Amino acid sequence: MKVVIVYSSRYGNGKKCVDCVDGALKARGHEVQVLNAPQSSPAQIPPADMYVFSGAAEAFGLAKGIKDYMNNMPELQGKKYALINTHGMSKPRGLPKMEKILSGKKKMVKVSEIHFQVGKEANTGNGLPAGYEAQLVQWVAGFA
């Protein structure tokens, strides 16, 4: 299966999640392409069997990089997607916003989601909880 991962990460927590998912997918024999949303053209999103989108919740919304990318990419009707959301709040407020764009406007089909509440070290890129890698590997095994 060909998987495209699109991410936006200000402090590096989301990038760590993406790197782990990239490795887990490749270990399962999948072809993976990783795109940094702010440095990529949404109009030229590569064709894939599945997409993974990763972004942080910031100020009760989505990080600008991933939000702009998803809003400006073409409709991918019927294509499967999974979501990764990092956030500093008690609830993953970014997931519903991501789903609204992808399932609503882009007519894609969600297959899975995962989120991590980052801790006090979030702005250093070390805010993820202990064991996040194992959780991500198990998460990937559930859909790939």
Regions found by a protein language model. Give the residues of each.
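N-terminal beta1-alpha1 ligand-phosphate binding loop
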Residues: 2-26
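Flexible, glycine-rich phosphate/dinucleotide-binding loops
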Residues: 12, 41, 90
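FMN-binding flavodoxin-like domain, especially the glycine-rich phosphate-binding loop
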Residues: 16, 24-28, 33, 47-144
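Short acidic loop-to-helix transition motifs that present clustered carboxylates
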Residues: 35-40
